[in-house]
């Protein structure tokens, strides 16, 4: 089975052709980072307009690289939720038009489910029998990105087999990285810059600038708004740091965020009695997170599965794969499929403060 996946939920226009076994035949991503950088974040109207310009050429390139035509496809998958309404609508309209014209089945995919299953993608011609880097169900997954941060128990690929164990009460981890980077004058997107600077910093030298982020509390919930405010107060009092002081502050900030992500994910795996941990989402590309999660899992005898960088950030391949599994299960959507800004995965974490 060969499925085309289309992803336009935020600021990447992406399309890919993937088999139901997870083999990536093509994967094309057009980033909008340069368009949004002057604004310090994603502008929904700008995103939707650029998706409208890019989606058809990106889909054509994905089909061409895979060596297939629309007639060769077994189905078309598209991100239908969650995301920016206008951006989602562009991808949906493109997918619907192609599905109707080619007479192919259409399936909508929850963007978060795509991230949670991205670990199963095989890139670069890996042997079909090579399962060393693929987990078995169930596993505990940390999904951390610019819009979402949550820990899930994943018992299978279906929506009903995925359960949230804990999530952020306010900002997502990636959002915190971008906001702190903006405070420090590091530009957008901030995550990669902070990660690079943190590698040369001493977190202890700036420990007074950041709080501990609930890392030691038993709850599996996160809160990242406080650390942003703490850094803002630090900068307001002392000015924007430069040189080694900047690297130290980045190291302290990143260390606090990563410690919370790692400790709570490991705690969730042990509480669920599951020995497999998966990382997903754009923040999973952070080298500090990868290193600390690997060390923590090794100490506790947990098997860690981390997708390659191309599978962590938004991409069409994860949407195509999740869609292929839906198609293989006999599921279909109609041309009435509409965009939804919220995930279909049930939430257990309340936004805002207060005890659960």
Curated annotation (Swiss-Prot):
Annotated GO biological process: tRNA threonylcarbamoyladenosine modification
Q: What class of enzyme is it?
A: transferase
Q: Which InterPro entries match?
A: ATPase_NBD, Gcp-like_dom, KAE1/TsaD, TsaD
* EC number(s) per entry: 2.3.1.234
Provide this UniProt record's keywords sorted from A to Z: Acyltransferase, Cytoplasm, Iron, Metal-binding, Transferase, tRNA processing
Q: Where does substrate bind?
A: 143-147, 178, 191, 195, 286
Show the Pfam families listed in the entry: TsaD
The entry's Fe cation-binding residues are: 111, 115, 314
Q: How is the cofactor bound?
A: Binds 1 Fe(2+) ion per subunit.
Q: Where in the cell is it found?
A: Cytoplasm
Q: Summarize the protein's role.
A: Required for the formation of a threonylcarbamoyl group on adenosine at position 37 (t(6)A37) in tRNAs that read codons beginning with adenine. Is involved in the transfer of the threonylcarbamoyl moiety of threonylcarbamoyl-AMP (TC-AMP) to the N6 group of A37, together with TsaE and TsaB. TsaD likely plays a direct catalytic role in this reaction.
Q: What is this protein called?
A: tRNA N6-adenosine threonylcarbamoyltransferase
Taxonomic source organism:
Sorangium cellulosum (strain So ce56) (Polyangium cellulosum (strain So ce56))
């Amino acid at each position: 089975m060969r499925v085309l996946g289309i992803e336009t939920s935020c600021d990447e226009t992406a399309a890919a052709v993937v088999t139901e076994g997870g083999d990536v035949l093509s994967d094309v991503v057009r980033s909008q980072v340069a368009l949004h950088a002057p604004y310090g974040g994603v502008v929904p109207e700008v995103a939707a307009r650029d998706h409208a310009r890019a989606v058809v050429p990106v889909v054509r390139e994905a089909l061409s690289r895979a060596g297939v035509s629309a007639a060769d496809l077994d189905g078309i998958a598209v991100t239908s939720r969650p995301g920016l309404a206008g951006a989602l609508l562009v991808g949906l309209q493109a997918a619907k038009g192609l599905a109707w014209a080619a007479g192919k089945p259409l399936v909508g995919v929850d963007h978060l489910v795509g991230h949670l299953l991205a670990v199963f993608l095989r890139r670069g011609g890996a042997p079909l029998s090579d399962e060393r880097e693929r987990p078995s169900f169930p596993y505990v997954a940390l999904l951390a990105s610019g819009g979402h941060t949550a820990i899930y128990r994943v018992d299978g690929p279906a929506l009903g087999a995925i359960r949230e164990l804990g999530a952020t009460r306010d900002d997502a981890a990636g959002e915190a990285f971008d906001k702190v980077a903006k405070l420090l004058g590091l530009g957008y997107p901030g995550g990669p810059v902070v990660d690079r600077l943190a590698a040369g910093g001493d977190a202890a030298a700036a420990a007074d600038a950041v709080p501990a982020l609930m890392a030691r509390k038993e709850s599996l919930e996160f809160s990242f708004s406080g650390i942003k405010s703490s850094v803002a107060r630090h900068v307001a009092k002392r000015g924007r740091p430069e040189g080694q002081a900047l690297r130290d502050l980045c190291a302290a900030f990143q260390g606090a965020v990563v410690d919370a992500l790692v400790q709570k994910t490991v705690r969730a795996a042990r509480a669920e009695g599951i020995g497999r941990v998966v990382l997903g989402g754009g923040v999973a590309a952070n080298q500090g997170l990868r290193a600390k999660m690997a060390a923590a899992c090794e100490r506790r005898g947990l098997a860690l599965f981390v997708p390659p960088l191309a599978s962590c950030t938004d991409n069409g391949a994860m949407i195509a794969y999740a869609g292929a599994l839906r198609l293989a299960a006999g599921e279909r959507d109609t041309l009435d499929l509409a965009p939804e800004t919220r995930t279909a995965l049930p939430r257990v974490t309340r936004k805002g403060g207060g005890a659960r």
